[in-house]
């Protein structure tokens, strides 16, 4: 049924500050995707827009991710509409399965979910007006941003490998001596658990986005009834981490211990490119670090650890959920730490930076919602200072850190703990327990 809303009301809706913000964000995101598409094609590879468009017809890279994106979009739908959407997606996928089986093509599900998301976008534009159109477009936007984020990340990784031939692994590995070389230690532990432990950690590592959607669905469970989104939720943090993180890769390119000190992974890297095949059996020697040349295929995606950052965000946002969600958030964080270190994808220094990175972004988003009051500005500034200090220390003080592990090891951990403490203290002021005193945001100057 068409919504019957006065055109003046529609105009008023589009002039609301939050609608303007969402529209601006959409335009910026589109421009960003176009820029990445151009950059990827410059290096002879399809970009995020092309790869996503292919999945309308061809077998998608990740079916679970597409269905998770559809689930995220469906938070704006009624239960009847959700059942229709799920049925349509499954029906479309069955048709694709049958056709692929006939032509002996790659079998993968997920096209149906993408078709449903795109159909909802068409319905929003052609069959909805006013607030209902905005709400449905927000849902579609969140779903598409999740799948586009995966494609965007792939393009970013390609760009880092092509534009940053020199990597700084020797500096991070040297600094990691102050932390006791945790990647080497956890790597030996994971190997001792055998194939079972490795398969569990690998599944957790790969399905991180699906776990994020599960936590986000709980946060957004009232959207359909209230016809509005909450001010802050996990998806916002997840997307901002993915947007800002690759920029740090360009500044501090690192490939990881399995590549710099091992045989490589994911079909990239090799022993002849590494300093030696010593991970995880022998910690790297204490020699003066220097930038090292690496291939043009391996992503420079270690500093900071975005998997740790995303898992930390899931942990934070699961704290207000039911017990099973809190337990799941804790498990996902611990398992992600085990995978990132145990598979040799990251150094301990990356993990510390990833935690600080997440808390700073989370604080910034919360502070933005509250009007940038003093406590929020202080928290964001402190987190940014600590994060910057960590990266500078890894680059220019790595030898001193390795020579004095009894001093710098505790200092690194203390810097991370201090950000955690300030974040927790600030959140307690902003989100008091029921019955406690409520701190109101500081008054802001009126807009004239």
Regions found by a protein language model. Give the residues of each.
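Membrane-embedded catalytic cores of phosphoryl/pyrophosphoryl-handling enzymes
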Residues: 14, 288-400
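Membrane-interfacial loop-to-transmembrane alpha-helix junctions, especially the N-terminal start
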Residues: 15-28, 75-92, 134-140, 230-238, ...
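Transmembrane helical bundles and short interhelical boundary loops of multi-pass, membrane-embedded
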Residues: 381-441
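Intramembrane catalytic core of multi-pass membrane enzymes that act on lipidic substrates
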Residues: 110-206
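Interfacial segments of alpha-helical transmembrane regions
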Residues: 138-144, 216-267, 329-330
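Alpha-helical transmembrane segments of polytopic membrane proteins
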Residues: 51-68, 107-121, 142, 201-206, ...
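Membrane-interfacial catalytic/cofactor-binding modules of polytopic membrane enzymes
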Residues: 180, 250-323
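Juxtamembrane "helix-exit" motif on the non-cytosolic side of transmembrane helices
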Residues: 36-49, 95-106, 127, 389-403, ...
């Amino acid at each position: 049924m068409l919504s019957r809303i006065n055109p003046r009301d529609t105009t008023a809706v589009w002039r609301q500050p939050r609608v303007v913000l969402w529209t601006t964000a959409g335009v910026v995101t589109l421009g960003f995707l176009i820029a990445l598409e151009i950059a990827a094609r410059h290096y002879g590879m399809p970009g995020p827009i092309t790869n996503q468009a292919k999945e309308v017809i061809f077998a998608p890279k990740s079916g679970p991710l597409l269905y998770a994106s559809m689930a995220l979009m469906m938070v704006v739908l009624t239960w009847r509409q959700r059942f229709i959407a799920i049925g349509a997606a499954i029906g479309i996928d069955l048709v694709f399965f049958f056709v692929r089986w006939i032509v002996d093509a790659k079998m993968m599900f997920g096209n149906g979910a993408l078709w449903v998301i795109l159909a909802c976008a068409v319905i929003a534009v052609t069959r909805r007006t006013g607030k209902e159109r905005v709400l449905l477009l927000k849902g579609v936007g969140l779903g598409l941003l999740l799948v586009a984020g995966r494609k965007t990340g792939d393009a970013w990784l390609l760009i880092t490998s092509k534009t940053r031939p020199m990597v700084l692994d020797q500096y991070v590995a040297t600094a990691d001596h102050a932390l006791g070389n945790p990647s080497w230690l956890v790597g030996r532990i994971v190997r001792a658990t055998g194939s079972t432990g490795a398969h569990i950690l690998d599944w957790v590592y790969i399905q991180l986005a699906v776990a994020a959607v599960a936590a986000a669905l709980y946060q957004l469970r009232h959207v359909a009834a209230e016809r509005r989104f909450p001010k802050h939720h996990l998806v916002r943090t997840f997307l901002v981490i993915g947007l800002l993180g690759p920029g740090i890769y360009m500044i501090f390119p690192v490939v990881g211990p399995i590549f710099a000190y091992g045989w490589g992974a994911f079909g990239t890297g090799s022993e002849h490119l590494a300093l030696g095949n010593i991970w995880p059996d022998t910690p790297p020697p204490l020699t003066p670090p220097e930038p090292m040349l690496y291939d043009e295929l391996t992503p420079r995606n270690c500093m900071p650890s975005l998997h740790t950052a995303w898992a930390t965000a899931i942990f934070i946002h699961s704290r207000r959920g039911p017990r099973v969600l809190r337990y799941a958030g804790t498990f996902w964080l611990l398992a992600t730490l085990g995978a990132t270190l145990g598979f040799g994808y990251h150094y301990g220094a990356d993990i510390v930076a990833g935690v600080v990175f997440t808390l700073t972004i989370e604080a910034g988003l919360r502070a933005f919602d509250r009007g940038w009051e003093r406590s929020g500005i202080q928290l964001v500034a402190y987190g940014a200072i600590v994060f910057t200090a960590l990266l500078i220390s890894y680059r220019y003080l790595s030898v001193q850190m390795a020579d004095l592990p009894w001093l710098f090891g505790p200092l690194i951990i203390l810097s991370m703990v201090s950000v955690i403490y300030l974040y927790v203290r600030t959140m307690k002021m902003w989100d008091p327990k029921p019955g406690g005193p409520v701190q109101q945001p500081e008054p802001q100057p009126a807009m004239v």
